[in-house]
């Protein structure tokens, strides 16, 4: 009887674990892409939370080189609340939109030459619930926060590895960009602590990758003014007056300091028409792609009506970098696309970024302590910055890295493309942290994909940049 009870319990446990990750699908083709996919793509849901009330959606792309032995990385898009389609189709995945003008059909896709999946297995996760195709079954489960995300990522991974045991021994990394600068280092720490507590399966965590990482809002805000001056966006006189009147502090300014406030208003005026994610690019308005996306089966006139615009000139032209955001709204909401990806019927309309609709608590105001703890554990890290990003200036990232106070093992130098052209600049520290700038890059990798792909390939293979 005791043996029978044990067998029943064992079978129930296997059934429960299988149920957590049973909604997976091998995707052989996608609407918008001609022919079968030339890479292996799996999508699915993993149930997490106390009662399995959170359903996190993922895209898993196997490495094109040697998936059995190549590293595995989970990629977390910033936001919080932005879809991982941003990573898969905009940043470092194997597909991208062609950028043709929208004609009412499914936007066409094409292969990229710069995918990070050429050398690594990548798991693109839609987190927290409410991001992309992920959802929650109850209002309470829908609530999220910085620390809750970290715990859920750890829980997701251990459930996912149960279903994919062949990848347990692969070197594992956590990657992300923008607001994920707050989440990724904490998730690495959470995974490490889980391993130490004996949580199974053990995750072979080796390090993390961060692009243009939001780390400390005060530091980032403080470095925007000198960045703007260095880029010629404000005058010497205004910069010097800002330095004097504000005492070099440009955040939490004393409202009684009228001179500082007036100077900051002048600074804001100079920056108001600059595209902050990449100061050299055309400032295309993209507010409409952040709100509810339009009905797919509609003509151009109806599209403009739903976007509350009067003429086609109010829509971004295909030459605009952000036009791909417009296309993603139509692609991701197409019924055939959702069916091909295995999206559950409970999921409503897809938004590229759904931040305003997620009940989210911001708890981490400074992520530097997580970097300190991860350095003490001996984890590798790659931190990179586009040098034309004014949202999270590369100089602000350099500042908190210097504050870690680790000795330099490879000092500031250019790193080169294969064509012997300068791709950016790099420095490596004794805590196994590599910092790199991306020449001409913005917020984030998607603006200079060839350089970022080469940087990642060298770093993940243990080569110097």
Curated annotation (Swiss-Prot):
EC number per UniProt: 2.3.1.91
GO biological process per UniProt: proteolysis; secondary metabolic process
Activity control summary: Slightly inhibited by phenylmethylsulfonyl fluoride (PMSF).
Expression sites by tissue: Expressed in roots and flowers, and at lower levels in young leaves and seedlings. Expressed in mature seeds and detected in expanding siliques.
Positions glycosylated per UniProt: 103, 310, 373, 405
Annotated S-S bridges: 82-353, 246-260, 284-320
Phenotypic effect of disruption: Plants accumulate sinapoylglucose and contain low levels of sinapoylcholine and increased levels of choline. Decreased levels of both benzoylated and sinapoylated glucosinolates.
Superkingdom assignment: Eukaryota
Reported modifications of this chain: N-glycosylated.
Reaction it catalyzes: 1-O-(trans-sinapoyl)-beta-D-glucose + choline = O-sinapoylcholine + D-glucose
Pfam families: Peptidase_S10 (PF00450)
GO cellular component: extracellular region
Position of the signal peptide: 1-23
GO-annotated molecular function: serine-type carboxypeptidase activity; sinapoylglucose-choline O-sinapoyltransferase activity; sinapoyltransferase activity
Keyword annotations from UniProtKB, A to Z: Acyltransferase, Disulfide bond, Glycoprotein, Secreted, Signal, Transferase
Function: Involved in plants secondary metabolism. Functions as acyltransferase to form the sinapate ester sinapoylcholine also known as sinapine. Able to convert in vitro benzoylglucose into benzoylcholine.
Family, similarity comment: Belongs to the peptidase S10 family.
Binding partners and assembly: Heterodimer.
Record protein name field: Serine carboxypeptidase-like 19
């Amino acid at each position: 009887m005791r043996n029978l009870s044990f067998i029943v319990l064992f079978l129930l446990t296997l059934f429960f674990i299988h149920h957590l990750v049973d909604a997976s699908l091998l995707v052989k083709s996608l609407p918008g892409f001609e022919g079968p996919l030339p890479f292996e793509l799996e999508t699915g849901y993993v149930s997490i939370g106390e009662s399995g009330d959170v359903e996190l959606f993922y895209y898993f792309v196997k490495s094109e080189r040697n998936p059995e032995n190549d590293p595995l990385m989970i990629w977390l898009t910033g936001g919080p609340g932005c879809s991982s389609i941003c990573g898969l189709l905009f940043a470092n995945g194997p597909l991208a939109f062609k950028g043709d003008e929208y004609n009412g059909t499914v936007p066409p896709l094409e292969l990229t030459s710069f995918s990070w999946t050429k050398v690594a297995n990548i798991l693109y996760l839609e987190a927290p619930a409410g991001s992309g195709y992920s959802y929650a079954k109850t209002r309470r489960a829908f609530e999220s926060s910085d620390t809750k995300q970290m715990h859920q990522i750890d829980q997701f991974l251990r459930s996912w590895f149960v279903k994919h045991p062949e990848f347990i021994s692969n070197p594992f990394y956590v990657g992300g960009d923008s607001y994920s600068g707050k989440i990724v280092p904490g998730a690495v720490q959470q995974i490490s602590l889980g391993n130490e507590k004996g949580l199974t399966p053990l995750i072979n965590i080796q390090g993390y990758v961060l692009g243009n990482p939001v780390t400390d809002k005060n530091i980032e805000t403080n470095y925007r003014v000198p960045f703007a001056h260095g880029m010629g966006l404000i005058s010497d006189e205004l910069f010097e007056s800002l330095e004097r009147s504000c005492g070099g502090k440009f955040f939490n300014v004393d409202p009684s300091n009228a001179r500082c406030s007036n100077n900051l208003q002048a600074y804001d005026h100079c920056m108001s028409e600059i595209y902050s994610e990449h100061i050299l690019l055309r400032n295309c308005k993209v507010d409409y792609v952040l709100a509810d996306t339009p009905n797919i089966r509609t003509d151009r006139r109806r599209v403009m009506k739903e976007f509350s615009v009067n003429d086609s000139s109010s829509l971004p032209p295909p030459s605009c970098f952000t036009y791909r955001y417009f296309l993603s709204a139509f692609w991701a909401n197409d019924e055939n696309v959702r069916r091909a990806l295995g999206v559950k019927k409970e999921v409503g309309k897809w938004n590229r970024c759904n931040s305003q609709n997620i009940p989210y608590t911001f708890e981490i105001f400074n992520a530097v302590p997580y970097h300190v703890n991860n350095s003490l554990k001996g984890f590798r890290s790659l931190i990179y910055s586009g040098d034309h990003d004014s949202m999270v200036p590369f100089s602000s990232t350099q500042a908190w890295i210097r504050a870690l106070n680790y000795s330099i093992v490879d000092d500031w130098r250019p790193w080169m493309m294969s064509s012997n052209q300068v791709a950016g600049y790099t420095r490596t520290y004794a805590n196994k942290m590599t910092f790199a700038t991306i020449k001409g890059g913005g917020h984030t990798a998607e603006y200079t994909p060839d350089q970022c792909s080469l940087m990642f390939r060298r770093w993940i293979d243990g080569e110097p940049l």
